[in-house]
């Protein structure tokens, strides 16, 4: 019986687990370097992101139609984790003294958002 259950577990499809990616395309403002924006992103990851299950990395295009873009890719374990983190971030914007609002002010001073999308990833 144990062998039959083991075979069934290996052969039958199981639930798919998906990370959720938060992808933001932006351009840096004059006077803001990539290194400056990367520094803000590292602070975000170390403080806010880690506490909310969200980790961001930045991508620079090697080939593409616009090499001036910077792409933010935030990664969470699930859509639920992303939703909870987003609720905390969005609600904190009402308090200009919150950690979130202060980080957002630094991001906004350094970049102009072009687009935003989210994706579930599967392996």
Name the predicted role of every residue range.
Residues 1-2:
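N-terminal hydrophobic targeting signals that begin at the initiator methionine
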Residues 5, 9-94, 105-123:
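Short S/T/G/P-rich N-terminal loop/turn motif that feeds into the first structured element of a domain
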Residues 98-100:
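Non-heme di-metal
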């Amino acid at each position: 019986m144990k062998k039959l259950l083991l075979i069934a577990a290996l052969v039958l499809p199981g639930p798919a687990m998906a990370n959720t990616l938060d992808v933001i395309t932006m351009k840096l403002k004059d006077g803001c370097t990539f290194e400056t924006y990367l520094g803000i992103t590292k602070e975000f990851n170390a403080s806010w992101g880690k506490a909310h299950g969200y980790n961001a990395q930045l991508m620079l295009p090697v080939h593409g139609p616009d090499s001036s873009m910077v792409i933010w890719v935030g990664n969470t374990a699930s859509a639920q984790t992303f939703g909870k983190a987003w609720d905390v971030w969005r609600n904190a914007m009402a308090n200009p003294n919150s950690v979130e609002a202060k980080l957002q002010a630094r991001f906004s001073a350094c970049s102009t958002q072009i687009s935003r999308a989210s994706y579930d990833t599967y392996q």
